[in-house]
């Protein structure tokens, strides 16, 4: 990880901080806290999530959704608001580089225990909490527009963005407050002591332009899980993932984040350490199930909104606009657009009546999907491609496996070529532990294009030395069925996604445990049909051996069944 993220890790950790809010007379580590991004250490300037300010708004949370509400001045909050920011020092070590180490653990900061001697330090101590003031609250109008399109209307009741688990009791008022504050952020001025003023400011941060990071690109999230709780342990915790989907400034990543990381920075590897976005909601729930995505707001439009807001405020505050980080441009010497991996554009949307799912083109006029997406042979289906431009082509199901077949596969012949859709190279071998990605239309369907999720190939299940099932740790959701599974290293097509895992006893779904059909099972038959239109090879799939059927029924072979002890 350090080889890929070395520079970005340093930038992320130097930019990370924790923000806590309390009422006058209460402990500094109050009940409201989140993560933040340090824009300047001297003078102190921090951007954090706005949700912690809802209890202090003079006009209540309804002011956040008022018509035309783009920013609110600092005096929108009550006078009893007390803010504190905590970050790690950036003092250079003996070698001239910034030291890196988790701060020494002092138990009373974590769990209200009797004071005692701190444990031996494993790094540098944290800075003491610094007082701060609210300069303004701001939102990104374009973020809200795309949020309403994706999560509003009839789907609104299915979605929750609460940091609480689905079984935790959260009042309707609290949930409404959280939703109103979802896309709001806060700009804070940090009051520094003489020691902090003299501290090294650290390298300048730059912001990645909107649209410069492609789907599937690796991302690094830096936040403080659980906010003000135990910063000795949790301050600036890192999480890796990829950019899963994009809708204007609304971004999704499969990096796993926890409550308290709201407002944390999201960084890219190219250019190293450029700020891409800030965390909006670390946990997303749909129909009571954890989706496995973290909701982000792109940094570039957010900083543009901050500049506009600062210029409307008194001159002393407006001068802070010069401290906001610039967007990546010519000085960095890198192109502003990255086409990303070719395989990220390989998935297509397959619609059969009211049913839809994913698919992958294996030839210009041949698409593979799942039987439960297109179950009937000769059925008419509509295949949509969204990259690089949206096209819709009618096709016909020429083959679908029988219900009793363990391989859930259907093959669609198209009336026209799928232009500009990359045809993947089928893999010949599989390597457990290799980095992989899934591309599919899960969760959003055609409203947001295909999503990319990352993980590893966790298992290759074989029967008589032949791979018959692949398992991955990628997040797979309803609608991803039929989508492609790719090797990140080679870009080759490894398999076809068929399902995630569901516990029939509890009803819980596990998106990070899923199953794919190895492409080596399908490739000879697909090649035969593509060349000769002969379905004989595909028909052989219906005659899969009993050991293969046992594997796909998730049963233990009879020879391995436990013997009775009676």
Swiss-Prot record:
Self-cleavage gives rise to an N-terminal 15-kDa fragment and C-terminal 45-kDa fragment upon import into the peroxisomes. The full-lengh TYSND1 is the active the proteolytic processing of PTS1- and PTS2-proteins and in self-cleavage, and intermolecular self-cleavage of TYSND1 down-regulates its protease activity. GO terms for molecular function: identical protein binding; protease binding; serine-type endopeptidase activity. The active site is at 372 (charge relay system), 408 (charge relay system), 481 (charge relay system). It is an enzyme of class 3 (hydrolase). It comes from the Eukaryota. It is found in: Peroxisome. GO terms for cellular component: cytosol; membrane; peroxisomal matrix; peroxisome. Residues 319-531 are annotated as: Serine protease. InterPro entries: Pept_S1A_Tysnd1, Peptidase_S1_PA, TYSND1/DEG15. Peroxisomal protease that mediates both the removal of the leader peptide from proteins containing a PTS2 target sequence and processes several PTS1-containing proteins. Catalyzes the processing of PTS1-proteins involved in the peroxisomal beta-oxidation of fatty acids. This is Peroxisomal leader peptide-processing protease. It comes from Homo sapiens (Human).
């Amino acid at each position: 990880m350090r080889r890929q993220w070395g520079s970005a890790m340093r930038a992320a950790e130097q930019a990370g901080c924790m923000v806590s809010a309390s009422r006058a007379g209460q402990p500094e580590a109050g009940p409201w806290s989140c993560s933040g991004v340090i824009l300047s250490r001297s003078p102190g300037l921090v951007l954090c999530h706005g949700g912690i300010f809802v209890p202090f708004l003079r006009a209540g949370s309804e002011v956040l959704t008022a018509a035309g509400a783009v920013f609110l001045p600092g005096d929108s909050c009550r006078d009893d608001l007390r803010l504190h920011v905590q970050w790690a020092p950036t003092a250079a070590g003996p070698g001239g580089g910034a030291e890196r180490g988790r701060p020494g653990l002092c138990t009373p900061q974590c769990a209200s225990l009797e004071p005692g001697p701190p444990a031996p330090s494993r790094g540098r101590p944290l800075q003491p909490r610094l007082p701060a003031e609210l300069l303004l609250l701001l939102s990104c109008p374009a973020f809200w527009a795309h949020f309403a399109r994706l999560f509003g209307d009839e789907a609104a009741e299915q979605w929750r963005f609460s940091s609480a688990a689905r079984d935790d009791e959260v009042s309707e008022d609290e949930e409404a407050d959280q939703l109103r504050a979802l896309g709001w952020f806060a700009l804070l001025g940090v009051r520094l002591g003489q020691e902090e003023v003299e501290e090294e400011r650290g390298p300048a941060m730059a912001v990645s332009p909107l649209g410069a990071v492609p789907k599937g690109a690796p991302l690094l999230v830096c936040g403080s899980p659980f906010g003000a709780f135990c910063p000795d342990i949790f301050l600036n915790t890192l999480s890796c993932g990829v950019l899963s989907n994009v809708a204007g400034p609304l971004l999704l990543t499969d990096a796993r984040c926890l409550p308290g990381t709201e407002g944390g920075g999201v960084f890219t590897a190219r250019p190293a350490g450029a700020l891409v976005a800030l965390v909006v909601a670390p946990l997303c729930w749909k129909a009571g199930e954890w989706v496995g995505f973290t909701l982000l707001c792109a940094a570039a439009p957010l900083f543009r909104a901050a500049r506009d807001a600062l210029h409307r405020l008194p001159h002393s505050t407006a001068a802070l606009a010069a401290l906001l980080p610039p967007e990546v441009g010519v000085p960095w010497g890198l192109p502003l657009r990255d086409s990303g991996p070719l395989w990220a554009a390989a998935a297509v949307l397959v619609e059969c009546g009211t049913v839809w799912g994913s698919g992958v083109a294996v030839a210009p006029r041949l698409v593979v999907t799942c039987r439960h997406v297109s179950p009937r042979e000769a059925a008419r289906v509509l295949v949509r491609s969204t990259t690089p431009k949206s096209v819709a082509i009618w096709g016909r199901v020429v083959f679908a496996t029988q219900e009793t077949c363990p391989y859930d596969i259907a093959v669609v012949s198209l009336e026209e070529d799928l232009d500009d859709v990359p045809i993947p190279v089928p893999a010949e071998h599989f390597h457990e532990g290799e980095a992989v990605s899934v591309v599919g239309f899960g969760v959003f369907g055609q409203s947001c294009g295909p999503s990319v999720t990352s993980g590893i190939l966790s298992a290759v299940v074989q029967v008589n030395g032949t791979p018959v099932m692949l398992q991955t740790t990628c997040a797979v959701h309803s609608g991803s069925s039929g989508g492609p599974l790719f090797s990140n290293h080679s870009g080759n097509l490894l398999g076809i996604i068929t399902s995630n895992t569901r516990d029939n006893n509890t009803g819980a779904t596990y998106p990070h445990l899923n199953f794919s059909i190895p492409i080596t099972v399908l490739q000879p038959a697909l090649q035969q049909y593509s060349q000769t239109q002969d379905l004989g090879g595909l028909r052989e799939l219906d005659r899969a051996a009993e050991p293969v059927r046992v594997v796909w029924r998730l049963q233990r072979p009879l020879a391995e069944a436990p013997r009775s002890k009676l």
